[in-house]
Amino acid sequence: DPTLHTPIGFLTDAIQKANEARIAAFSRNGIGLVIMGDNGYYYHQLPQGMLDVILDVNKKEGRIIDINITQFGKCWSVISRVNNKLIWNALASDDIYNKLHALNSQGKDIISLAMDEYSNYVIVCDDGTIECSPEFEATVRQAKNKFGKILSACVTNLGGCVLCCDRGVYFKSIPSSAADIL
């Protein structure tokens, strides 16, 4: 949407000015967050709950590990490490919450959560465990076979998926401009 270039432009300008971005997440409607260095950040129109989590992690001198904002900004997640403990915070569907709680009850530490507005998801744990919705099962399997352990994930509402792995980046159904950069 051409009317949204200004907010995204503000965030990309911030990245260029700082000459770094450790993690970034953008929505289709202009919501965005860029994490730099040890947790410096720029944001535009973040949901208050997500902003509160970012501020709390910084106050506790934690480190933000992973962020996700869905394409329309309805759902979000922040994975952080505070006092050497991995913590997730999210606004997500009940199905995704149930998966996150089930993994935690098994002693799994979540390091990445990617989701869309339709409850499709990829959850990555530090021990290599992956939970995902059926839509991404084949993609996850192919990525692991080709590039090894999955370290982080990103998904789109249109079934697109990017998986960062030990030995490379695997992607499916993403715009060619994004694929060219990867």
Where are these regions (language model features)?
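Short beta-strand motif characteristic of blades in beta-propeller domains
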Residues: 1, 25-39, 66, 71-84, ...
